[in-house]
Structure formats: C-alpha cells, structure tokens
Amino acid sequence: MPCKTKKELFMSNSHNKQAFINILCEKLNEYDIRYKNAVDDADLLIAQTAVDCALSSEVIVIGEDTDLLVLLIHHVNQQCRWVIFKSDKMAINKKMKIWNIQQTKGFHGEDICHLLPFLHSLTGCDSTSRLFGIGKGIALKRLNQEYLKAQGQLFMNTT
C-alpha cells in the first residue's frame, strides 16, 4: 500500500525513518546489492565512500546539503578520478547545481579546501548554528587573512 504522507513528514519521525532504512537494507540484501548503513550522521560515510570509489572510477554523488559538499571538497584527493556533486534541490526558476569537486579544489586551492570544515562549522552546518551576520561567502573571502587561517589550522589539528 502506498504511503500518502509527504516524505519530509514521514522521515521526520525517527521510528519511521529507521523502519524505512531497515526495509530498504533488506531489499538491497535480497538482490546482493552492497550498501553501507551509517550509525549516526551519514554525510561523512557518504564522502568517504565516494572517495574510496573514486580511486577506481568516476563518481556522482547526489545530495541535499552543504555539509556533504564541504566534506567531498575536503576529502577528495589527487588519486581520485572525477567526483561530481549534484544538488537534489532546485531553486525556483534556477538550474540544478552541479559541482566538479576537482575543479572546485583547483579554483580554491588545497590550503582553503583543507580549512573548509572549519569555515563551514563557523558559519553554520547540521551540527552548529551560524554566527549572526557571517555568511559563507564573506567568511570564504576572509579565509585568506592570516589570523583566520591560523585559527582554522588550530581547529583542524585538534579535531
């Protein structure tokens, strides 16, 4: 019987979400399809799995949040083949956003990409609130300043 509830409402209930995941895993297992089930937040597992797969083939990751994009940019390395991130959300009257992770890393440089998790947590992510009045664009421009870079290095070395 089809579920007539909106996806967001259904998945907002943790019991429903876990039951759906369990059923999906059972079905995938029936067809010998490999899967990974994240215990906590799935973003890091998705990014690490994409990097592992990208060592032998091109990878397309479809996701809905900036956390995943930041983790991909941070973790993809030179040994990886092409990694593409496609947003599954389309803004009204706008095109779907698609990022080539290697080109994005090339544009921003390794130093900035290494510090992106620091910048992202400072400006708001799934697990932290953003500081009032500091957007991601402004913070990214300021990341070239030595003081902010030093704070970012300290943050990244202690996590």
Regions found by a protein language model. Name each.
Residues 1-159:
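Noncatalytic, typically N-terminal accessory segments of nucleic acid-processing enzymes
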